[in-house]
Amino acid sequence: MNRWLLPEDIADVLPAQARKVETLRRAILDLYQSYGYELVAPPILEFLDSLLTGTGSDLNLQTFKLVDQLSGRTLGLRADITPQVARIDAHLLNRAGVTRLCYAGSVAQALTPVGGSSREQLQLGAEIYGCANGEADFEAITLLLKTLDLAGLKKVYLDLSHAGILTGILEGQQLDKESIETLYGLLQSKDRPRLRQWATCLPAKLAADLLALTELNGPCTEVIANAKKVLPRHAAVDQALADLECVVSAASKSLSGVELSIDLADLRGYQYHSGVMFAAYVDGLPQPIARGGRYDQVGKAFGRSRPATGFSLDLLTLAGLSPLNCRKLAVLAPWIDDADLNQVIADLRNRGEVVIQVLPGEVLEAAEYECDRELVKQGNSWELKKK
């Protein structure tokens, strides 16, 4: 066996990429802090029952499992940080008002994600707890778009949906868990022939409503207008459309350079989402660069129901798409025993400069740094000169 091989869909992050990832991580977390978000760092391992509380079967399948040698209980290696942050808000912080939290940490997935990305990701996200209003959803969307803009991704396509639409349509229907999962899969793929065949055992009006969802996608105002015509008049459906109208109205007034659309059959994450959902797309990536939405019921599983909304993305993917040049400029210095030189180097480093002292016999080959200046002794002092 080759000792340098890694598991399938697991990869090292090499210096140039790691530099970009870390530069973006710092800048993005500083952005979140400027909005009042507090950084939290949940553990990478938790007891499995806690880790999966309030989530669906998809997360269970994606979670690596192992036995705790101390307690004998099953542990899970987290595949998603969002439920952990919900636990922190509900159980540890226990605040009454609005709480804004952000995070950045590694997650591991047992199965290769859709789109063939790495099974190890650096998940970054922001969550708002304690506000049920549409303004919180819009703040989350705004912060996501600013995140992408900070990474240099200027052309963004934002797709909206709402979990309440299907909840309202299915109210009163006795569908088992397997049937619901099949239905969501058919809606997600917009496979109308199979959906029509699957729905033959349902009431005709319900089958027609489900088929209508697969065609309710496109420009926001057009989709909302058509949805009001073809979907049933139901409190949950009406509220969902009103929520979407609120977000679209706010976006049209204050967001520029973003193409908005609605897809009422896009229900990924349906297991825990409860309201407005959104996905951001950028050129060069067929899958969403980020996903988010409202998930008011997750905290209830930890003993404290709280309105919640937010988003997350993979920072490794974001860095790979970012056009930013994060290559660091550096100063070259000789490796000699000189107190004055050492003091100059220390002063430069304290000011944030990168100073590379060339070791005896070293041939500088690293592409990570661009040495555009060097320290040269002129008379009795060391001077910084351009190379």
UniProtKB/Swiss-Prot annotation:
Pathway(s) this gene product operates in, as recorded in its UniProt entry: Amino-acid biosynthesis; L-histidine biosynthesis; L-histidine from 5-phospho-alpha-D-ribose 1-diphosphate: step 1/9
Cellular compartments per GO CC: cytoplasm
Lyase listed as a keyword: no
Domain of life: Bacteria
A GO BP entry: L-histidine biosynthetic process
UniProt-listed Pfam families: tRNA-synt_His
Alphabetized UniProt keyword annotations: Amino-acid biosynthesis, Cytoplasm, Histidine biosynthesis
Cellular localisation: Cytoplasm
Family membership noted in the UniProt record: Belongs to the class-II aminoacyl-tRNA synthetase family. HisZ subfamily.
Subunit (UniProt): Heteromultimer composed of HisG and HisZ subunits.
Entry function: Required for the first step of histidine biosynthesis. May allow the feedback regulation of ATP phosphoribosyltransferase activity by histidine.
HAMAP family reported for this sequence: HisZ
PANTHER family given in the database record: HISTIDINE--TRNA LIGASE, HISTIDYL-TRNA SYNTHETASE
Extra remark: This function is generally fulfilled by the C-terminal part of HisG, which is missing in some bacteria such as this one.
Record's protein name: ATP phosphoribosyltransferase regulatory subunit
Organism: Polynucleobacter asymbioticus (strain DSM 18221 / CIP 109841 / QLW-P1DMWA-1)
